């Protein structure tokens, strides 16, 4: 670390290479990692072949390509699927596989409206993996954030990007801020006008290693400007989901 830029390299990785991190990890996190024989990036290589039963061709392609991207240690991936192609079901499928086979600790599912968060929660609650006859929620805890509290026993956290931004800023979220796309709401304008709206600073309550993966739903609306700070804060693989990417989205 130079005091301004901090880089980290895990020599247990298949092809160790440094990466920039927002802040350094907690000592207890490093101690926990040292007790494990394999790093997350090594465990990603151990993900078994996908069981294709019950999946559409587009869903199969998306999951396979995503996992191949992870195995190449690419930090970002973009999944483009047409509306109605089962984007959230696809997300449930690869989230399950990351938790079950790569032993991911916690995954953040980011949306930009409360309604989309509720829909995602219902999808996860109804999801039954094709290698089991039990529901996903019988294996893993799903929490939709309605306050700043992130349960320590949750494996999937669903949150609006507005709420996660407010959590990192240590601020209360305005009532109604999650009801509409923030880029079209007065709340976004209020944040821009605040003298201390930027930048996000390190929060000991939410360490950078809180999530191993971040799934960004409707990412064509949520990966720029104010919101990019949320994505840059965490040391996590990023997975963008969209049906309507633009040129900036492909640059993600």
Where are these regions (language model features)?
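ATP-dependent helicase/translocase motor core
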Residues: 1-106, 115, 119-131, 152-156, ...
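Conserved structural-core and active-site-/substrate-pathway-adjacent residues in large, well-folded domains
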Residues: 2, 59, 84, 113, ...
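Short beta-alpha junctions and helix-cap segments that line functional grooves
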Residues: 94, 123, 141-146, 225-227
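Conserved SAM-binding loop
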Residues: 109
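Conserved helicase motor
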Residues: 114, 136-147, 161-166
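Acidic/polar loop patches that form or flank catalytic/metal-binding clefts of enzymes
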Residues: 131-139, 239-240, 248
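Short amphipathic alpha-helix with an adjacent loop that forms part of the alpha/beta core around
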Residues: 149-150, 205
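Signature of the SF2 helicase/ATPase Hel1-core->accessory helical subdomain module
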Residues: 162-252
